[in-house]
């Protein structure tokens, strides 16, 4: 998947028709979607329409993000997939659910995702 993502920035895939509408939901993205949907965090059925859920978030983000601050023409489904993975990591830290690969220091002065 990472190879395909990298090839997207070459002549081979720069004109791919599904750049904005497809991304592979990895384990972190699936857990992030599960958190948002209130599903069991371990739910990971491959036949589930993960891409449809990510596309819905992509559409919502395009409606709500300020185009004067973010170049939305470069905002792809890959950003949604990566954002969901990061959301899951930060949620695990906040909820003290196991360990993460990297160490993050919590700062109570920074806003939580719920406050943004």
What are these regions (language model features)?
Residues 4-116:
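C-terminal accessory module of base-excision DNA glycosylases/AP lyases that mediates lesion recognition
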């Amino acid at each position: 998947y990472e190879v395909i993502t990298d090839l997207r920035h070459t002549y081979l895939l720069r004109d791919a028709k599904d750049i904005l509408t497809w991304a592979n939901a990895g384990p972190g993205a699936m857990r992030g979607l599960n958190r948002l949907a209130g599903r069991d965090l371990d739910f990971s059925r491959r036949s589930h329409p993960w891409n449809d859920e990510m596309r819905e978030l992509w559409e919502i983000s395009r409606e709500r993000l300020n185009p004067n601050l973010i170049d939305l023409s470069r905002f792809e489904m890959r950003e949604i997939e990566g954002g969901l993975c990061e959301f899951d990591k930060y949620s695990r830290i906040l909820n003290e659910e196991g360990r993460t690969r990297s160490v993050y220091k919590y700062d109570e002065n920074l806003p939580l995702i719920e406050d943004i």
